[in-house]
Amino acid sequence: MLKKINLKNKTALVTGAGKGLGKACAIALAEAGAKVIILSRTKSDLIKVNKIIKKTKGSSQLFVCDVTNLDDLKKVLRKISRLDILVNNAGNNRPQHFTQVSQENMEYLTNLNMKAAFNVAQLCSQKMVKANNRKKIGGSIIH
């Protein structure tokens, strides 16, 4: 998918990497040469994605992480020395008619789709600007 792009010596983190778009992004980034750090709540999904990446001769590291848990997220990010690319993909939807949405569902979706997305972006961007040997300050964030 990204074979014309060279991401050698780049490190990418993908949240929600166990399925769907996150899985596809993780595999594509690995095919382009990036070292990919994959996060998901579901270990079995991460293991499957990790195997696919390894078959393509890509490099990946997996972490089971609930991004709505700030302590879990910080613990994972402490283990990462460099970060160049973030695919902030973790998210969910619980389709319901607006008049039927419970407080519990609203809080769950707000925590995952807004608060967690903010926390992931903020903490990862802090890591990006602190990276050694960076020619310019920053990195790439995809939401």
Which role fits each region the language model picked out?
Residues 1-10, 133-134:
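Flexible N-terminal pre-Rossmann segment of NAD(P)-dependent oxidoreductases
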Residues 11, 18-20:
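Conserved glycine-rich cofactor-binding loop
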Residues 34-48:
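Conserved glycine-rich Rossmann-like NAD(P)H-binding loop of the short-chain dehydrogenase/reductase
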Residues 44, 63-75, 103:
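The beta1-alpha1 cofactor-binding region of Rossmann-like NAD(H)/NADP(H)-dependent oxidoreductases
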Residues 89-94:
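Conserved NAD(P)H cofactor-binding loop of Rossmann-fold oxidoreductase domains
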Residues 97-98, 105-110:
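Substrate-binding pocket helix/loop in short-chain dehydrogenase/reductase
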Residues 121-122:
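A short, exposed helix-loop element centered on a Lys and neighboring polar residues
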